[in-house]
A protein has these predicted regions:
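Alpha-helical interaction elements in eukaryotic regulators
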Residues: 1, 5, 25, 49, ...
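Long, structured protein-protein interaction/assembly regions in large complexes
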Residues: 3, 10, 16-399, 536
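Noncatalytic, typically N-terminal accessory segments of nucleic acid-processing enzymes
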Residues: 7, 56-58, 63-73, 82-96, ...
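Short secondary-structure boundary/capping segments
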Residues: 174-176, 189, 220-225, 397-404, ...
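Short helix-terminating capping/connector loops at secondary-structure junctions
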Residues: 197-201, 374-380, 405-408, 831-833, ...
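Flexible loop/turn segments at secondary-structure boundaries
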Residues: 214-215, 390-394, 420-423, 846-847, ...
Length: 943
């Protein structure tokens, strides 16, 4: 009893007197009464404030019509509630804040959403709040839309609904149904499928691609591979377009139906298309292609060179200032003027169930896009961006079907994002096994797995940054190479300029030529990206022209063929479609999602982002097995994604016009990576100081054979010749079909070098085939000349006797058989004689002493070879070392060839020892260099 009383009255204290307990007040009775009075007064104030706010809340009549207006959050809550919440969060103040914080708006909306006019006090009450539509605020609706779009998880939405954070799942389905049916009704009335957010009178482009959903549920039996079409409008300060009505449904007409109406049949039904069999030949090309093709060599000033000079200057600083921009994107953004464009208007059309990789779907997509574009901008030629496989289908439709699909009616573009990805993959193929990925790993720029992924351009943004770091590093390494050259020049010698030194070094050193070519190719790829970011159409066309020969040389036939067609189309654009060309020159061939500098992206890039927003991270579990749910997602998905974008656009803070890389932390990290990569290259050997005639993998010091060196020296010439021949034969003369196979070069590279050795069985088969052909010719000749067949095999008919040799190599004997023939004349002696000097066979010692834990050749000598030699000096006065000499015409040459061959590797003190030690010793040049290295080290030993 005492404990319960004390818990109820905390101001009381207990005093024990014998068996009795006395309860008394801690303080004076007056203070207690005053405190009780004050609490009653505060309770009255709170009650008055609550009544005022509740009165205003209950008068709120919200209605959601399918759009989030810019001031929808502020208009959905009463001013009294907003003021009270602001005072609670920030404290009472006389300062008026015109911009309410999002925190204040969020709490206020949740209060309104969870408010009830009266409390239901029933025994069967579950405690959940009953929400009415009149007090539905934008935030709970947005929360449900966001969760559904991201996870598509009903239970998660219901959990947050019970917490009072979002609307229920049933209400979400009701909204999606009303929106979808209202949108479809509008499409029926207008006779065309064209989203209401698009404006009239604006230049409009489109993108088409697959949209794939692979169900992750173990009970799923199917997947979705449909087609998505997005429309993009390009407003600017001069042309903003005319708004169309955006209310997508009437909130006063509530409906409980969850049934989705059907789309217009003219849109949803894809008619079949069949192409007549025939030769696929490119239409006649105007003279503008030739002039553009020839004039494109006169490139404009390259900002990439200025960036490299700027990076070299900034790397000499110990610490960067906040105004120093060393990364490529930040530097280019600092040199770009503020854009005059407005953020693009992007809308996704209802999706199709049909796969995009079909002639019928591509032809239907072209019709759908043309109808929508002409509805809002009647005089415009439709512009459609697609990936490479769809581009090939679209061009076939244009060239074979013609009429309403021909090149006068449509402009088909190859997606810029896919061109960039293909370019970096091609660059990765050229860099494979060169040591580039290992250099990035050793520098700490990336882990080995991530560095290897750069070769395949698995993550485009990371890959692009890695090449930027590499380009800045290679440029500085080349400058250091030139400084070393200047230090070696005598006073009486003429000093070469940097350009003269570079050209001379490229002619002499394959190593210099390879890495200088890598730098040029990286800058070419960055120039393509800069054309997108700056919306520079002429630079875009020139960058494509510079990259195309590499696709031919490195055997990328699909992009070599169809990117050439795209290049042809862009060159013909000024004469064939001058209005489209004028818009492209204004920057409308890319998408400006924000007002940030140097941030425009390609059409197919923004289409991929829109697709990702519709699909979310939850996949399409259960959709493909439910036709109604699938149709709801196909039609309502774009509209729900549009509403989420509207809400998030309203809550975004004041837009920053600076590029996202123009931050001091990003620049410091970039400079650190460049310095680390330079150190990594210098540890392995600066490729621009190598004056040798060999091409070496910098990480392993493996020496490439002559075929790889020839590839490095001729790759540019081969690509240019094949590209020029392709343009002449397919576009100008039209003597060949566009689908005729391209010549495959199979150029040996770092990853493919090495000669193939025929097995014994295959070698025997080759010899038998040669003998059979030879005998046939000799037999026929003998008969025609009345020869004596009895003497047919009297003479040798091969350059070497088959009984003594095979494929030009002497047949070897068995040493064990020779040992048996030697007489046993000497006696066995188990004790070593006492001598003053010994002669050691260095080659035998190397074969006998494996590297064990030694990592480099320096460590091998210090930890393995030298201790063995010093051990011999303990019992003798003098030790002599002799080494093998490998003569090209030695009798043992064939025996060594039978043992196989390993990888050629340069021997330097810091060179890592190969894992295959036996294979390394099978190469005569490796042993020559290793023996010389060990002999020179032995000469410097002190006893």
């Amino acid at each position: 009893m005492k404990d319960r009383v004390l818990a109820a009255f905390p101001d009381l204290t207990a005093h024990t007197q014998g068996r009795e307990v006395l309860l008394a007040l801690k303080h004076e009775i007056g203070d207690v009464l005053k405190e009780a009075k004050d609490k009653d007064s505060e309770a009255q104030h709170l009650a008055k404030a609550a009544n005022i706010v509740r009165r205003d809340i209950l008068q709120i009549k919200n209605s959601f019509n399918g759009t989030f207006e810019p001031e929808c959050q502020r208009n959905a809550i009463p001013a009294s509630l907003k003021t009270l919440i602001s005072m609670i969060i920030k404290g009472p103040t006389t300062k008026i804040d015109p911009a309410d914080s999002q925190t204040c708006l969020t709490v206020s909306q949740l209060v309104v959403f969870n408010s009830v006019s009266r409390v239901r006090d029933r025994p069967d009450s579950t405690g959940s709040t009953h929400h009415i539509r009149a007090r539905e605020c934008p935030l709970p609706i947005y929360a449900a839309l966001k969760i559904h779009g991201t996870t598509r998880d009903k239970s998660l939405i219901e959990t947050f609904y019970k917490l009072g954070i979002c609307i229920s799942y049933d209400r979400l389905l009701s909204i999606s149904t009303e929106i979808t049916n209202s949108v479809i009704g509008r499409y029926e009335r207008e006779g065309v499928v064209c989203p209401s957010k698009l404006r009239e009178g604006l230049f409009t482009t489109a993108a088409v691609d697959n949209i794939d959903h692979n169900p992750s549920s173990i009970s799923a039996h199917d997947s979705f591979h449909g087609t998505a079409i997005s429309l993009v409008q390009h407003p600017n300060t001069e042309e903003r377009g005319n708004d169309r009505a955006t209310d997508v449904f009437d909130p006063t007409k509530s409906s409980t139906s969850k049934k989705i109406a059907q789309l217009p049949s003219s849109y949803s039904e894809v008619p079949p298309v069949a192409l007549p069999s025939g030769q696929l030949r490119v239409p006649e090309t105007t003279g503008q292609l030739i002039s553009q093709h020839q004039a494109s060599s006169n490139s404009e000033s390259d900002r990439e060179i200025d960036w490299l000079d700027n990076a070299k200057e900034l790397l000499s600083k110990e610490e960067l200032n906040k105004s120093d921009f060393i990364s490529w994107a930040a530097y280019c953004a600092s040199k770009s003027s503020l854009p005059s464009h407005e953020p693009a208007i992007i809308s996704l059309l209802p999706m199709f169930f049909e796969n995009a990789h079909s002639l019928a779907m591509i032809a239907h997509s072209m019709k759908v896009i043309k109808s929508a574009v002409q509805h809002i901008n009647p005089s415009q030629i439709p512009v459609i961006a697609v990936d490479q496989p769809l581009f090939a289908l679209a061009k076939q439709i244009q060239w074979i079907l013609g009429e309403i699909y021909n090149e006068d009616q449509y402009v088909i573009m190859l997606g810029g994002l896919h061109i960039e990805m293909a370019a970096f993959k091609m660059l990765g193929k050229w860099l494979t096994c060169s040591g580039w990925a290992e250099s990035l790993c050793n520098a700490g720029v990336a882990t080995q797995g991530v560095a290897d992924s750069f070769l395949a351009a698995s993550h485009l943004t990371r890959t692009r940054r890695a090449h930027q770091v590499t380009a800045a590093s290679l440029n500085l390494l080349m400058s250091k190479g030139y400084e070393e050259y200047l230090a070696k020049v005598d006073d009486n010698q003429q000093v070469k300029s940097f350009q003269e030194w570079k050209e001379d070094s490229q002619r002499k050193s394959p190593q210099f030529l390879y890495w200088a070519g890598v730098l040029d190719l990286q800058l070419c790829c960055l120039k393509l990206v800069r054309a997108f970011r700056e919306a520079n159409f002429s630079m875009y066309v020139n960058a494509i022209k510079q990259i195309l020969p590499w696709f031919f040389a490195l055997d990328h036939p699909n992009y070599a063929r169809w990117l050439s067609v795209h290049y042809r189309d862009m060159c013909e654009l000024p004469g064939k479609h001058p209005h489209v060309h004028a818009q492209f020159c204004k920057g409308s061939f890319v998408v400006h999602k924000t007002k940030r500098c140097f941030s425009s992206i390609a059409l197919d890039h923004v289409h991929e982002q829109v697709n990702a927003g519709v699909k979310g991270e939850g996949g399409a579990v259960g959709l493909t097995e439910n036709p109604a749910a699938l149709r709801r997602w196909m039609v309502a998905g774009p509209e729900l994604a549009r509403m989420v974008e509207e809400f998030e656009g309203n809550i975004s803070s004041a837009e920053d016009h600076h590029h996202h890389e123009q931050k001091h932390g990003f620049q410091s990290a970039f400079a650190k990576d460049v310095k680390s990569l330079i150190s990594s290259y210098e540890e392995m050997g600066n490729p621009f100081t190598d004056e040798g005639l060999e091409l070496i993998a910098i990480h392993t010091k493996d020496v490439m054979d002559a075929a790889v060196v020839s590839s490095v020296q001729t790759v540019s010439k081969i690509g240019e010749e094949q590209f020029n021949t392709f343009v002449k034969e397919r576009f100008v003369d039209r003597s060949k079909l566009i689908t005729d196979p391209l010549k495959k070069n199979n150029l040996p590279t770092f990853s493919t070098q090495g000669k193939k050795i025929l097995s014994k069985d295959k070698a025997k088969v080759e010899i038998l085939k040669e003998d059979c052909a030879l005998f046939s010719r000799l037999y026929i000749a003998c008969q025609s000349r009345d020869g004596n067949l009895e003497e047919f095999f009297k003479y040798e008919n091969q350059p070497w006797p088959p009984s003594l040799s095979q494929m030009g190599s002497l047949r070897g004997g068995q040493k064990a058989d020779l040992v048996k023939c030697l007489p046993n004349l000497s006696t066995t002696n188990t004790e070593s004689p006492k001598v003053d000097a010994v002669i050691l066979d260095g080659a035998v010692i190397v074969q006998m002493l494996p590297p064990k834990t030694a990592l480099t050749f320096e460590e091998y000598f210090d930890a393995v070879f030298a201790p063995y030699v010093m051990k011999q000096l303990e019992s003798v006065i003098r030790v002599d070392l002799v080494w093998d000499v490998y003569v090209s015409d030695s009798l043992k040459r064939s025996a060594r060839e039978k043992r196989g061959s390993g990888q050629r590797r340069k021997v330097f003190p810091s060179t890592r020892i190969p894992s295959d030690w036996k294979g390394f010793l099978r190469v005569d040049q490796n042993k020559d260099e290793l023996f010389k290295f060990l002999a020179n080290k032995v000469r410097t030993m002190t006893t």
